[in-house]
Amino acid sequence: MAQVQYYGTGRRKSSVARVRLVPGDGRIIVNKQDIREYIPTEALIEMVKQPLVLTETLGSYDVLVNVHGGGFAGQAGAIRHGIARALLQVDPEFRTVLKRAGLLTRDARVKERKKYGLKGARRAPQFSKR
């Protein structure tokens, strides 16, 4: 018999996460590693679990993630976004809870490009009056 799977794609900064939810005991596997091995800080791990905690589905699904691009914070945000989207396929009733927490909205903030003539995106060279 085919196993039930739910898919969700999450994005944050330059990271893209493809998330699969499979009925299981709550393991989170990121790029074939346990989440505790892959993501270094506890705060980011809690951030990833947020959609599961809000919908009270923390122990009922195994989360299988393939993520690339960006750093740890961006990847954690992308995983969280992907999990939230996958949970919508599990039960459309979760939409109100996830939307209220802001987990369904793609965080569009990305690093602003450096402009020529400036030292950074907005930082101007030091001004000398004379």
Curated annotation (Swiss-Prot):
PROSITE patterns: RIBOSOMAL_S9 (PS00360). It holds the Pfam family Ribosomal_S9. Signal peptide: none annotated. The keyword Ribonucleoprotein applies. GO terms for molecular function: RNA binding; structural constituent of ribosome. The keyword Ribonucleoprotein applies. GO terms for biological process: translation. InterPro entries: Ribosomal_Su5_D2-typ_SF, Ribosomal_uS9, Ribosomal_uS9_bac/plastid, Ribosomal_uS9_CS, Ribsml_uS5_D2-typ_fold_subgr. Belongs to the universal ribosomal protein uS9 family. This is Small ribosomal subunit protein uS9. It comes from Geobacillus stearothermophilus (Bacillus stearothermophilus).
